[in-house]
Amino acid sequence: MSDKNGEECWYALKVFYNRVFELEKQLSQEGVRSYIPLLHEDTVAGDKKIRKRKPAVSSLMFIRQSEHYLLELQDRMKASCPFMAYFDRETKKPAVIPDREMELFMQITSADTSDLEYFSDEAIDYRSGDKVRVTGGPFKGAEGYIKRIRGNRRLVVALEGIIAVATTYILSLIHI
């Protein structure tokens, strides 16, 4: 999948100094779709319960835009909010994330659960397990691989070359 004729695609970014929320705000003002895998931390201040957003993976965010816009934004933001796009080693261009992979990743990482574990793409051989589709629960419809991690069977969904996320074990599965 390439970015021909200004086609919008998903790209992964490493935002320096963990300024993901600053970049998210800027992108929102420009009408650009972005996604940050988040954790929600509940804290108590006095008698108020406060829920804070925190990046699940430091400095990682995704945007959906054209390659031209991405490169122009990178140049424009280098002084105030520097970031780099993950590059495809073969094409030497920003790595395009297929829409289906990104949808599955967002489905898993946006579930309101603290039982997710993130890995660099090289840290786990996620393709060695059985490919499955979840048929019930909060991850219904998600596809990934079953992998044994620290003795437990887990569902792993990966964005190749970027990151992998493992859920708790899911009982309702269909082998693909």
Place the predicted regions along the sequence by residue.
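SH3/SH3-like beta-barrel fold
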Residues: 13, 155-159
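Mixed-charge, Lys/Arg-rich low-complexity intrinsically disordered regions
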Residues: 90-128
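Short beta-strand-centered aromatic/proline hotspots
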Residues: 141-148
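Short, conserved beta-turn/loop elements at beta-strand boundaries and strand-helix junctions
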Residues: 149-154
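Conserved small/polar residues in nucleotide/adenosyl-binding loops
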Residues: 175-176
